[in-house]
């Protein structure tokens, strides 16, 4: 009976560690943020942040307006240069890697959709810049439209959509390039029911 209980306990412990990699002494963080700071003149937007985020982990940053959440995300994405510190993603120091070469996509709070493009053109924009084959682009855009439930609205322009629909366009555009890291700034701000 003791051997059986011990086996169950060991199995549960191993299962728990697999679900909580930060408890595994051998697990390597997928994202490491070390001493990250950002100064804007005399204002410290982000002050000496240290974080380890593991592969498959969902990580949320909560805080009041102006506390540095968006600035931290923008530094991870490469849109802001840290004043101090280091960002490592998948073992690679991102210090000298421009935003367009990082394995990161970001969905902005303001959506940043192109007003002169249709929904499908907005979603396909990144793939066209990567010079993917036309048939691959069509297929992936179709998958994304289905995923965000906008297939019926593919030919519409952003001004013809609700705020939540525009947000789903931005989400599809962020997901279509299959980033290793997806950063969402205020992701639930305008979603429709």
Language model features by range: what are they?
Residues 176-180:
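A short, proline-enriched helix->beta-strand linker immediately N-terminal to the Walker B motif
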Residues 157-161, 165:
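Conserved ABC ATPase signature
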Residues 117-126:
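Short coil-to-helix segment of the ABC ATPase nucleotide-binding domain corresponding to the Q-loop/switch region
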Residues 93, 128, 135-152:
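Conserved ABC ATPase "signature" region
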Residues 62-64:
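The feature captures the beta-strand-to-loop junction immediately N-terminal to the Walker
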